[in-house]
From Swiss-Prot:
It comes from Bacillus atrophaeus. Pfam families: Multi_Drug_Res. Belongs to the drug/metabolite transporter (DMT) superfamily. Small multidrug resistance (SMR) (TC 2.A.7.1) family. EbrA/EbrB subfamily. The keyword ATP-binding does not apply. This is Multidrug resistance protein EbrB.
Length: 117
């Protein structure tokens, strides 16, 4: 269960870092750069924690797929970016792929907890 929480935090952190990257305007705006660093550092830290209990293939596919979809939604909602019908279809395929990948996995044995948890 902790693995899923860490994975969710990794996704949120990655989307935050990507949003700050957009706001940095190619690293020409100083204040968002701290958000970029904090967001991506947190994302990889939480992703590494999630890998203690979640298979790499599932965790990484979920992190990148859901992160991609949420980043596109943030771009649409906050920055007025457009998403074409083909784009919506593509994002739907990404999410469907993540779901199918995760559903096709055999139930994993619970991995031993470590001191860090």
């Amino acid at each position: 269960m902790k693995g899923l929480l860490y994975l969710a935090l990794a996704i949120v952190s990655e989307v935050f870092g990507s949003t700050m990257l957009k706001l940095s305007e190619g690293f020409t705006q100083a204040w968002p750069i701290g958000g970029v660093i904090a967001g991506f550092l947190s994302a990889f830290t939480f992703l590494s924690f999630s890998l203690k209990t979640i298979d790499l293939s599932s965790a990484y596919a979920t992190w990148s797929g859901v992160g991609t979809a949420l980043t596109a939604i943030v771009g649409f909602l906050l920055f007025g970016e457009t998403i074409s019908l083909k784009g919506v279809f593509g994002l739907t395929l990404v999410i469907a792929g993540v779901v199918v990948l995760n559903q096709s996995k055999a139930p994993a044995k619970e991995k031993k907890q470590t001191v860090c948890e």
